[in-house]
A protein has these predicted regions:
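Conserved NAD+-utilizing ADP-ribose enzyme module
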Residues: 2-31, 41-48, 52-148
Length: 148
């Protein structure tokens, strides 16, 4: 119940503090979130999988994009724009359902701009082992989509 109230309050706060350019400020459980991967250390090729480091938080959050309703080319265009901004190479993405983030005890907050951007928040503070465990759980249910 407390997790729901926290999520509800944070979602309302985000909704009222800045306008959303995505179709909804509410993120539903079956919504797909893409984590763009800019490091070869964050995924494996044999077998194809997302590694936990791809989901380790930086400054208490993990950046993702809400990609429901987009075709693959549109998703990759978002990733390419981010890669260009950062002067990095885009190798792959990890796709995960929002429900899996919630099952791990984390929250997802829309964080636009850029359009469709959100952050996974609610990570244990100053507890790298717990953060790693949660990142492992997320990586285990994520689908790796290599860039062709």
């Amino acid at each position: 119940m407390m997790r729901f109230l926290k999520w509800f309050f944070l979602t309302l706060r985000e909704w009222f503090l800045k306008p959303a350019t995505h179709r909804s400020a509410i993120i539903v459980a079956n919504e797909t979130l893409s984590r763009f991967i800019f490091s070869t250390r964050h995924f494996g090729r044999q077998p194809l999988r997302v590694k936990a480091d791809a989901y380790m938080p930086s400054q208490g959050q993990v950046s993702v994009f809400r990609v429901d309703g987009l075709i693959a080319a549109q998703i990759w265009k978002i990733g390419d724009e981010i890669a260009e901004e950062r002067d990095r190479t885009l190798y792959a993405r990890g796709d995960i359902k929002a429900r899996e983030v919630g099952r791990s005890g984390l929250d997802i907050l829309p964080a636009e701009p850029p359009a469709r951007h959100a952050n996974i928040v609610g990570w244990p503070e100053n507890d790298k082992p717990r953060q790693k465990l949660i990142a492992l759980q997320l990586a285990a249910v994520a689908t790796l989509v290599p860039k062709e």
